[in-house]
Amino acid sequence: DKENMNSMKKKALAFAAAACAFGMLLSGCGSSNGDSTADKGSNVITAYNSEPQNPLIPGDCNETGGGKPLDLLFARLISFDAKGNASNEVAESIKSNDDATQYTIKIKSGWKFTDGTPVTAESFTKAWSYTANAKNAQLGSSFFSTIKGYDKLQDGDKLKGDEQLEGLKVVNDHEFTVDLNRSDSVFAVKVGYTAFAPLPESFFKDPKAFGEKPVGNGPYKFQSWDHDNQIVLVKNPDYKGNRVAKNDGVTFKVYTKDEAAYADIQSGSLDVMESVPASATKT
């Protein structure tokens, strides 16, 4: 079991480092003439992406096409640096009992979603319960399998979809507790996964519409999604965390062929691409 735990932690850190490395690359760069007021809006970077295969909902994503924009649109309890080291983002503190079966989580005050509504403890507990609930058929459901009551939310035919995980208890607007069904010492790392992002009340009123126009609390906010072409994010001026954008926005350009993206990198019409296609390395 300890070996499994270590393996999970390594995977968690690898995932975090990869997501963060990309996020840092984006938030750290911008065009050199971006300081000029005459060029307002030119300090926007373009990044390679594939078309998301699912709605832009944190708990319903399992591929990079959706994962990249979601990482920038949503702040979680913790964030990671390029080495995979965690630091608090929305969390004020995350404390576990001695056997790591209960966590007490306090969140910072003053955080808001881009629709102006506050980020509260319930923004997390309702989001996590929604994702865990089989009735809602979310791809990230299994991330919540160690939370008490998860098994009771797995028979979708008997559920309405709004049932809450019994292991989550809201203490007040800025504190909640998490009771687990078994010891999980890496839970405090897992809460940095995109699936653990908070959701505003508007999500629960119309999840389908939200998936096309997500409302987050991250360093960027959603502007538009032209399917199979591009996703446009702009800097969120109200973001209060440790991943502040150093540019005015990110435009994810959708490609079906890496070679086309690489050609755009070479011509200067694309700023960021994580890997070079094999054809470009042939001599």
Task: Give names to the regions the model predicted.
Residues 3-26:
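Sec-dependent bacterial lipoprotein signal peptides
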Residues 26-38:
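Bacterial lipoprotein signal-peptidase II cleavage site
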Residues 41-54, 92, 102-105, 124-127, ...:
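Short, well-ordered beta-strand elements
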Residues 48-98, 215:
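N-terminal lobe/hinge region of extracytoplasmic solute-binding protein
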Residues 106, 123-125, 132, 136-200:
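Surface-exposed binding/hinge segments that line
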Residues 174, 179-245, 249:
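Gly/Pro-rich hinge or "lid" segments in bacterial periplasmic/extracellular proteins
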Residues 205-208, 237-282:
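Ligand-site clamp/hinge motif
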